[in-house]
Amino acid sequence: MTEQAPTSSQAPAPTERKRARPGERREQILQALAAMLEQPGAERITTAALASRLGVSEAALYRHFASKAQMFEALIDFIEQAVFTRMAQILESGSPEGVPPEEGARQAHRVVALVLQFGERNPGLVRVMVGDALVLEHERLQARMNQFFDRIESSLRQCLRPAAGAAGSATPSVDAQVAASVLTAFLQGRLQRFARSGLRRLPTEHLEASLALML
């Protein structure tokens, strides 16, 4: 909705402080937290520091989140939704009659690339994904991130089983599980290296060549 500008015979209305729309302040808090996680010493973020960055009181934060742990839960919700929604699209791209072995390998490639590219675009969230930002928080948060990577590994196993069977393996399920485990460890290692290097070593560095050795 637009408003008509005052004419010359009208006095301008007094300027009022713009109030955040419902949900907007909550989003601003999460964006500020994610931005702070990109900085050195991010594992020691306090609600006081977060409130100072936003120019509000700590009480204002608690009107939207009951605790800092709840803020991290909201970040994890975003990570899961962003990654799993796209991953589902990748897995659904196969043939209705079944995924050919070569297509399964391509899907696995795309899943790994998806996670690493997401981390590269969201460096602050990488510290949540690898657990650095969760060390002093409630253990349920780390458990959720563990489940996140477990789900990725399960999806990779699903992608790779047709290839293991087509290769004549006597134990295709086991072989697919081993391959999925290796890929998951690889992407976790890339994300950890990104965080430990001060966000300098990009997760997608030499990605195509690296995956060519594993797929």
Where are the model-predicted features located?
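Basic, helix-initiating cap at the start of DNA-binding domains
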Residues: 1-53, 70-73, 99
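Alpha-helical structural segments
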Residues: 24-35, 39, 52-53, 70-94, ...
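A conserved beta-strand->loop->alpha-helix hinge within the catalytic CA
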Residues: 49, 102-107, 175-178
